[in-house]
From Swiss-Prot:
The active site is at S174, D259, H287. This is Esterase mpl1. Keywords: Hydrolase. The keyword Hydrolase applies. Belongs to the LovG family. It is an enzyme of class 3 (hydrolase). One of its GO terms (biological process) is secondary metabolite biosynthetic process. GO terms for cellular component: cytoplasm; nucleus. The lineage of its organism: Eukaryota, Fungi, Dikarya, Ascomycota, Pezizomycotina. Its EC number is 3.1.2.-.
Length: 313
């Protein structure tokens, strides 16, 4: 009788998937041991006996379904599962306020070097944009369609899980941050020309981690007077401005001060985002997502401030 009571008590335990992930070794074989389900990362093979027992007896309840949603775009040569792991500390600080949904880029790619050093077994790796001549050429309209399809697919999948929160923000790292800024700029142009109800999206803010200039054009029919490169071009070289394409939707930019390309990140901040709507967080790190508590807290604070400023529900 006493043993049965103990088992029932064990079945009621809740172990956060983020708690599990933060205690795993850095070099994981993710496809073999983890599966991403909405906002959760759960083991598919026994990692530790106690975890297996709890997972077997417990149906995890997702308590973020009603929260406002932030769509997250990974960097080039990465993927959605890797980016979710990289953002685990940020999610932990904001999980009672926002639901984070991670999109998968449409095009296959080699792993980015920093990704390869930690997540070499987490492939396949993907990209949003071309960054080297070896990437196959593609027509701009086909690239835009593939990107939009990926984003709409992940939104529909999240709706199907029962999520109901408004899509209030975009969050991206590196190439994903460039995509987030470009998506916000497209929304801004559409809202100016068509009105807010016909823009196709209504994101209130963007969180741009190590995002580099320039923006890319995601709607050539509307950007008739734009000097932006199209989405099919290689755009990693320094952009020679000044730019007439200025994003006014509020953004927070996160720059690692030891990132070798921080000058390109500053160019996106200074030349492509309006002074009255941009914020900056600088931290002592290189080209990666912040993980230390104090660094993450600065980013989380600015996200809360943006949400308040923009009236995000």
């Amino acid at each position: 009788m006493k043993g049965q009571t103990g088992l029932r008590s064990l079945a009621l335990l809740y172990i956060s998937p983020l708690y599990i992930l933060e205690r795993l070794p850095l070099k994981l074989s993710a496809p073999d041991t983890l599966v991403v389900r909405g906002s959760f990362i759960v083991p598919t093979e026994p990692l530790y006996p106690s975890i297996t027992m709890v997972q077997t007896n417990l149906e995890v309840v997702d308590d973020t379904l009603h929260l406002p949603r932030i769509l997250c775009l990974h960097g080039g040569g990465s993927n959605a599962a890797i980016f979710q792991a990289q953002c685990r500390r940020l999610i932990a600080q904001l999980r009672s306020e926002f639901r984070f949904v991670f999109a998968q880029a449409p095009f296959l790619s080699d792993a980015e070097p920093n990704v390869m050093s930690v997540y070499s077994q987490w492939g396949p790796f993907r990209r949003w944009l071309r960054w080297c001549p070896d990437h196959p050429e593609i027509r701009p309209e086909d690239a835009i369609r593939a990107i939009d399809d990926c984003l709409e697919d992940v939104k529909r999948q999240d709706d199907a899980k029962g999520a109901t929160g408004a899509w209030v923000g975009l969050l991206g790292f590196s190439q994903g941050a460039k995509m987030c800024a470009s998506l916000l700029y497209r929304q801004q142009i559409r809202q100016e020309l068509r009105g807010r109800s016909f823009a196709g999206s209504d994101y209130r803010f963007g969180v741009l981690l190590a995002g580099r200039a320039p923006l890319v054009s995601l709607d050539p029919d509307l950007d008739l007077n734009s000097s932006l490169p199209d989405v099919s071009q290689i755009t990693d070289a320094k952009y020679h401005g000044p730019s007439q394409d200025v994003l006014r939707i509020p953004t927070v930019h996160v720059h690692g001060m030891r990132d070798p390309h921080v000058d390109l990140h500053r160019q996106l901040f200074e030349e492509f985002c309006a002074p009255e709507s941009r914020r900056l967080v600088e931290w002592d790190g290189d080209h990666r997502v912040p993980l230390k508590y104090n660094d993450v807290s600065l980013v989380a604070y600015q996200i809360r401030e943006l949400a308040t400023q923009t009236g995000a529900p």
